Amino acid sequence: MSDYKHTLNLPETAFPMRGNLAKREPDMLKHWQDLNVYGNLRKQRQGREKFILHDGPPYANGSIHIGHAVNKILKDMIVKSRSFMGYDAPYVPGWDCHGLPIEHKVEQEIGKAGVKVDYKTFRQACRDYATKQIEGQKTDFIRLGVMGEWDKPYLTMDPKVEAGIVRALGKIVAKGHLVRGFKPVYWSVVGQSALAEAEVEYQDKTSTQIDVRFTVVDRDAVLKTFGTSEGEGDVSLVIWTTTPWTIPANQAVSIGADIEYALVQVDVGHGAERMILATDMVQGIMARWGVEDYKVLANAAGSALENQLLHHPVYDKQVPVLLGDHVSLDAGTGAVHTAPDHGMEDFVVGKEYGIGTLNLVKADGTYTDAAGEFAGVHVYKADEPVCAALEREGKLVRSEKFRHSYPHCWRTKTPLIYRATPQWFISMDKLNLRADALEAIKGVRWVPAWGQNRIEAMFEQSPDWCISRQRTWGVPITLFIHKETQELHPNTQELIEKVAQAVETGGIDAWYDIDQNELLGADADQYEKVLDTLDVWFDSGVTHDSVLRVREELGQFPADMYLEGSDQHRGWFQSSLKTSIAMNGVAPYKQVLTHGFTVDAKGYKMSKSLGNVIAPQEVMNELGADILRLWVSATDYSGEMSVSKDILRQTADGYRRIRNTARFLLSNLTGFDPDQHMVAPEDMIALDRWMVDRALQLQNELHEDYGNYAFLRIYQKVYNFCEATLGGFYLDIIKDRQYTTQADSLARRSCQTALYHVAEALVRWIAPILSFTADEIWQHLPGKRGDTVFYETWYEGLTALPEGFELGRDYWREIYAVKEAVNKCLEEVRARGEIKGSLSAEVTLYCEGSLAERLNYLGEELRFVLITSEATVKPVSEAAGVEQTNLEGLLVKVTPATHAKCERCWHHREDVGQNEQYSDLCGRCVTNVEGPGETRAYA
């Protein structure tokens, strides 16, 4: 037996089978950095239409987590895909650098500003801390394969950006949207600062709920309102609250004008008394209290009780009954304890009745001396002493613990309170900001579409935005207010620009160092400098002005896209929209894409206590960044994104299919030079020509999917193309032709031309997702090419089949179905042990009409398509005892091959051994080894 290996075109490539990504990717990163890929791409694309994805800045604190990775990978996939579309798509990453968490970290290291260190030193320490955090995060983002302006990111602590933030404030002031007010705001007693809605998150908390008697002052007048004198004992209006600590600040009780109230005779353990409760809630309240014996004496409308006076349950004072629209029958008693200091609805109803605030709680959460017996007590610890005082006064009806969802600071994770303080607000309604924003929302493309409803609902309910904070590390509110009138300086716009210029060179310290006398001249003594800082959401929210309009490589407003997690509907998307509408009257973005949160395989949130945290750094070090990138693509980002080690292992399996397909393509392009060996479309063998057309069809679909950010569909289509179209059909069929025909024959070069076109297209399709692998493939492709795939646009070498082409798309679609049916039959026979493989079989296909015509069209080459040693087409009338396949109208008979096996091509052919010199070869192989070589027309 001879060895014919040297006569075959065996696959060969230096492209490794194993990705070994964790080791290879860092080398690829260095390669990109050495080439300055991002910088060169910017030069190449200069003058092209821009696509600007504006980066929502992550907070400069801590290591990146899997959510950060999802966000940056999605952005990178979009930016890269737009680059392949021919756009100039720069990406300038940013960081949010000011705010409370950094202050806390620095306080732990060097102590409080103004106590242990001076403010300037403290701010510099904050700047140093943020810089260090940014470097750590930047390293991880780059490791993910994200390309961008990493050497010149935008930082909200950069003096130029800080100056831009100051100027943005000036524009909002100039437009009349800034107001100063004394209102209840979310207040962090830990941070001693106000918080905006976007900085609030809800967590479960154990609280005390209490029912409290407010005894009426004029019992006779109240009984007269109810039209009865029946019953005995005191008459009390009973409230229910989950914040006992606010009772000292109580100034009224609110009821519903249109709610009916019942006068109830009852004994809850303190003797006979009469309670006023919402009629519809009496039964539920009594059940909650465990009281069975009670009697409704009379009923009255809430409106009839307006302005009745009640005894405060703790202090020696009287409080009125008010009518409020916020009173509901969802929970409680139908009467609402009203403390304007500690609730927006309370504040609003109090304002309607001319009731102001008491300011009993200091910034640190302790009561002032005006709170009497509670002076110095912290609100976190006040429930117990307040309940004790109520018990002492005989006003506590019931008290019990319960768990509920409660607002917490999203940075410090500590419970918040509502506290009335003088603050600066952007008014939502003074100049129709709310209405204008709701109108602008309609003109934005929201991906997914439900994002529009979500942000609309938030804007409809959004209170005035409190933008002031009482912090050290933040952009200052650079305003001067008159000491007596509290009005802004008449030259505020001119002053803001002067301050902005100073900040541009000296950073935010310039505001504190500025000479007020020099700036204000003769007015200096009449004005005081505002010492509040801006909400960090304002910092990031105005980057459409301080970064997008200012950075030369961006220079476009509005941005084409904002992309963040779904929590940013109430965060960055909202703050950006509010400021942009206030400044420009238009939305700052044309499209907004949101992605869901990452959860484990069971849908649980990631937490160290559950042990289900997937750290991106670990994934990159074990599996490689491309596996993480592929997982992002293969997951529906519109909802929660499940990730676990098992899920990532499954992703790695999908990766291997794509990599192995690429390796097959590359290994079969050995000896192929596209400049010399490329076959023109009209000269290609029919199957090859169809393959190129199929790739073009898919490329058109993928272009559309990339345009619609449908990354899951892209992954599925590319995977199926590799698995089914290539692996299960085309590559299977062409192996014989590729390996056995003469090296420079049309049969082989046509096949290599198709493989080359497919490889050129595939490497670009996957590059936005599998960036490292794509560039590795790129370096192993034959022919002259640029240094990296990322300089390219979509491949333009794919050609469509001409109209009316006989062996067109429908033809090969039917052949594909036939091959699937035949494969099923072959597998059944192989499983019975009658054949070893498809080449040790002969098949007879029984069919009629057009199907028979189509199969016969291939003639002798039908066996190459079916990968059998013989394939014959016969009429159905001859199919006695042959079973129908799953393809209607086709019956298949499989029999073991009876002829000798060719040692070169492994086909069993009757002409094996007819040539004395090559006694173990079939005639076709003899022709290919020594003769002119075989010719193929179809497959």
From Swiss-Prot:
An individual GO BP term: isoleucyl-tRNA aminoacylation
Species, as recorded: Marinobacter nauticus (strain ATCC 700491 / DSM 11845 / VT8)
Its taxonomic placement starts with:
Bacteria, Pseudomonadati, Pseudomonadota, Gammaproteobacteria, Pseudomonadales
Q: Please give the subunit comment from the record.
A: Monomer.
Q: PANTHER family from the xrefs?
A: ISOLEUCINE--TRNA LIGASE, MITOCHONDRIAL (PTHR42765:SF1), SOLEUCYL-TRNA SYNTHETASE (PTHR42765)
Q: How is the cofactor bound?
A: Binds 1 zinc ion per subunit.
Query: What does the similarity note say?
Result: Belongs to the class-I aminoacyl-tRNA synthetase family. IleS type 1 subfamily.
Identify the InterPro entries for this entry.
Answer: aa-tRNA-synth_I_CS, aa-tRNA-synth_Ia, Anticodon_Ile_BEm, Ile-tRNA-ligase, Ile-tRNA-ligase_type1, Ile-tRNA_ligase, M/V/L/I-tRNA-synth_anticd-bd, Rossmann-like_a/b/a_fold
> From the record, which residues define motif 'KMSKS' region?
605-609
Ordered alphabetically, the record's keywords are: Aminoacyl-tRNA synthetase, ATP-binding, Cytoplasm, Ligase, Metal-binding, Nucleotide-binding, Protein biosynthesis, Zinc
What name does the UniProt record give this protein? Isoleucine--tRNA ligase
